[in-house]
Amino acid sequence: MKLQLVAVGTKMPDWVQTGFMDYLHRFPKDMPFELTEIPAGKRGKNADIKRILEKEGEQMLAAVGKGNRIVTLDIPGTPWETPQLAQQLERWKQDGRNVSLLIGGPEGLAPACKAAAEQSWSLSPLTLPHPLVRVLVAESLYRAWSITTNHPYHRE
């Protein structure tokens, strides 16, 4: 199974790149984790935000591999504690399909992305900066993997 993070935004601060890449490189060869960045639409004073959101959504869905399970990162999604995420990761592995996790831009996810999702995961009821979400998702998935393999990274 391959994990894919599809995220709006291409110019992340160095701390995001460093944190995300640290976890990305920790994933084992049998569970590769990749990042697909979608350019954010230009948001000016007179921007058509609805159209920008639609375009970002179209690009996100086009980046998802055929047959992939789509999981959105969204505040109203299901909150998973770490052991629950580990169980979820195991179910995804048993399903045999690749998993694409979608992080929207400043206005969130396009309705088309939400409609295409099989699951929606809430990291927190708080509104989080999208760059931070990349790092949180990578760390959370790595921690979940460590639980499923009895790797010493996670401690109770």
Curated annotation (Swiss-Prot):
Catalytic activities: pseudouridine(1915) in 23S rRNA + S-adenosyl-L-methionine = N(3)-methylpseudouridine(1915) in 23S rRNA + S-adenosyl-L-homocysteine + H(+)
EC number from the UniProt entry: 2.1.1.177
Coiled coil: none
UniProt: S-adenosyl-L-methionine binding residues: L73, G104, L123, S124, P125, L126, T127, L128
Subcellular location: Cytoplasm
Keyword Nucleus part of the UniProt annotation: no
Gene3D superfamilies, A to Z: 3.40.1280.10
GO cellular component: cytoplasm
Keywords carried by this UniProt record: Cytoplasm, Methyltransferase, rRNA processing, S-adenosyl-L-methionine, Transferase
Superkingdom in the source lineage: Bacteria
InterPro entries: Alpha/beta_knot_MTases, RlmH-like, tRNA_m1G_MTases_N
Positions of transmembrane segments: none
Root EC class: transferase
GO MF, one annotated term: rRNA (pseudouridine-N3-)-methyltransferase activity
One Pfam family it belongs to: SPOUT_MTase
Oligomeric and partner information: Homodimer.
Protein family membership: Belongs to the RNA methyltransferase RlmH family.
Function summary: Specifically methylates the pseudouridine at position 1915 (m3Psi1915) in 23S rRNA.
HAMAP family: 23SrRNA_methyltr_H
Descriptive protein name: Ribosomal RNA large subunit methyltransferase H
